[in-house]
């Protein structure tokens, strides 16, 4: 067979080569301290060829075992630092946190869907980001605000339990049900109501998540602007995002019409207990009252709302799915968890949030799930300026990948790290707050996830209800040891196969009287 190179592909390759040669002439190498060790780089593509054919966090872990916990890669033209140990994570998240406080820029999909980085997750470190963080801590995701969504959580989870109960003895796709549940909770918290249009919004958001996993050459060579313009992905993302934007525009318009002013007694209620406002109301109030020193347009509000769905739902959805899968694979853990929740809520017939703090073993299960299966296995940062770690030079504008998945399976800190053992967290001081660098499922430092309490609230109650009301069997007579625990990596690390289970109501459940 004759191998033919298209003229267009050759021109692109030739253009990249000329661009990189010109860049090297413009920025000649200086006699500086060395970069961290790493595998040899090929011309133009660097180490790009070594990152294909598997899950990135697995590949990076394997490379770090040869080149060390502080490793340098070249991904296209991007200088990339990979962190794979607790000690190096501390350097990034604490010692040099200010130097590593940016998020990666010039990512095609994220640039479009975040309205040019106007959201919380992807905005660059500076005055605007600091103001957004303050808004999150005081208004959007404060303890009072999260508590104000308690009715939404309890009502939504109870409805899912009723749906499962109506299918007792039949196979249910628990993965799909969990996804629908968490999206529904977030939609009601953000928009105040649930409608068919919000279902369309969720479908579009899922499509963007899928597109975000596509390999984009322009992301590897951001200095070559023509690559982004020529990318077929740009058209697809812009087409989907246009529909998302239309829905968000309608939502903002409706909220403005329905909630022009707030009476004084409502303001007092807002201050005392989180009020009845949804998140769109809160953002519109901030805009109307001029509480931001930096510009705060409708685009900023829409970017933040989209954040709530993309970042605010995936972690909880994936964690509940993984936790149930791990308990199905480890019947000993399932049995102990069911006994705990049924004892704590004995005689009540249902589970609410009043006694969740008493479920210590369930809390340990959640922590262990997020250790073995962190929703974001790689925490991404970008350096603001050059710094030095362990005698190595860390360039400015370098991409940084903290392999949280590898660190949380480090046998130096976690005995028998690949086994699911919630008991390791009983009596342990290790928590989600980012101060224990061997365990950072929500990141750490100044850019730690601001929605930890919101995420955990959306994980605890569904799990407690699933454990309380039902005994579970794997579909098709599958044995626990046969359950497929393979993962796929999109914008988060989720199970490859949906979790198909057969529910049977437990005698303590009062659901049958409610269905």
Swiss-Prot record:
InterPro entries: Cyt_P450, Cyt_P450_CS, Cyt_P450_E_grp-I, Cyt_P450_sf
Gene Ontology CC terms: endoplasmic reticulum membrane
SUPFAM superfamilies assigned to the protein according to its UniProt record, in alphabetical order: Cytochrome P450
Signal sequence coordinates: none
Tissue-wise expression: Mainly expressed in aerial organs, including stems, leaves and flowers.
Pathway membership, UniProt: Alkaloid biosynthesis
Membrane protein topology class: Single-pass membrane protein
GO BP: any one term: indole alkaloid biosynthetic process
Function recorded in the entry: Component of the monoterpenoid indole alkaloids (MIAs, e.g. echitovenine, tabersonine, lochnericine, 19-hydroxytabersonine and horhammericine) biosynthetic pathway; MIAs are used in cancer treatment and other medical applications. Cytochrome P450 catalyzing the conversion of tabersonine to lochnericine.
UniProt protein name: Tabersonine 6,7-epoxidase isoform 2
Organism: Catharanthus roseus (Madagascar periwinkle)
């Amino acid at each position: 067979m004759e191998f033919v190179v298209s003229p267009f592909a050759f021109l692109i390759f030739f253009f990249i080569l000329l661009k990189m040669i010109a860049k090297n002439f413009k920025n000649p190498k200086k006699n500086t301290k060395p970069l961290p060790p790493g595998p040899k780089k090929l011309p133009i593509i660097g180490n790009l060829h070594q990152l294909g054919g598997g899950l990135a966090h697995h590949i990076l872990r394997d490379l770090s075992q040869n080149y060390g916990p502080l490793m340098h890669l070249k991904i296209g033209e991007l200088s990339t630092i990979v962190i794979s140990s607790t000690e190096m994570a501390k350097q990034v998240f604490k010692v040099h946190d200010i130097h590593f406080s940016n998020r990666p820029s010039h990512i095609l999909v994220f640039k479009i869907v975040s309205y040019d980085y106007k959201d919380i997750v992807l905005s660059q470190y500076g005055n605007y980001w600091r103001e957004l963080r303050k808004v999150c801590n005081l208004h959007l995701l404060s303890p009072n605000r999260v508590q104000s969504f308690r009715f939404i959580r309890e009502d939504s989870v109870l409805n899912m339990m009723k749906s499962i109960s109506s299918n007792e003895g039949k196979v249910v796709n628990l993965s799909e049900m969990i996804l629908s549940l968490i999206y529904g909770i977030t939609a009601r918290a953000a928009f105040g109501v649930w409608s068919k249009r919000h279902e369309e919004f969720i479908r579009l958001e899922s499509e963007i998540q899928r597109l975000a996993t596509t390999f984009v050459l322009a992301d590897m060579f951001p200095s070559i602007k023509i690559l982004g313009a020529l990318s077929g992905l740009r058209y697809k993302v812009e087409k989907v995002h246009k529909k998302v934007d239309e829905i968000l525009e309608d939502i903002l318009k409706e909220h403005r019409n329905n909630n022009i002013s707030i009476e004084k007694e409502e303001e007092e209620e807002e201050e005392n207990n989180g009020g009845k406002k949804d998140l769109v109301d809160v953002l519109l109030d901030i805009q109307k009252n001029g509480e931001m020193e930096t510009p705060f347009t409708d685009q900023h509000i829409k970017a933040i709302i989209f954040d709530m769905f993309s970042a605010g739902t995936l972690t909880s959805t994936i964690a509940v799915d993984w936790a149930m899968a791990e308990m199905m694979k480890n019947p000993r853990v399932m049995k102990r968890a069911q006994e705990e929740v049924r004892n704590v809520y004995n005689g009540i017939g249902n589970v609410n949030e009043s006694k969740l703090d008493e479920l210590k073993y369930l809390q340990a299960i959640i922590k262990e799930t997020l250790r073995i299966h962190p929703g974001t296995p790689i925490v991404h940062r970008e350096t603001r300026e050059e710094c030095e770690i362990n005698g190595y030079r860390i360039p400015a504008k370098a991409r940084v990948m903290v392999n949280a998945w590898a660190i949380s399976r480090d046998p130096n800190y976690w005995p028998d790290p690949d086994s699911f053992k919630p008991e390791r967290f009983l009596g342990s001081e290790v928590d989600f707050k980012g101060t224990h660098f061997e365990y950072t499922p929500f990141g750490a430092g100044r850019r730690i996830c601001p929605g930890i309490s919101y995420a955990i609230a959306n994980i605890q109650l569904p799990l407690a209800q699933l454990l309380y009301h039902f005994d579970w069997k794997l579909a098709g007579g599958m044995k626990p040891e046969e359950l497929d625990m393979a993962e796929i990596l999109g914008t988060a690390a989720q199970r490859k196969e949906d979790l198909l289970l057969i529910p049977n109501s437990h005698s303590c459940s009062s659901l049958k009287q409610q269905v």
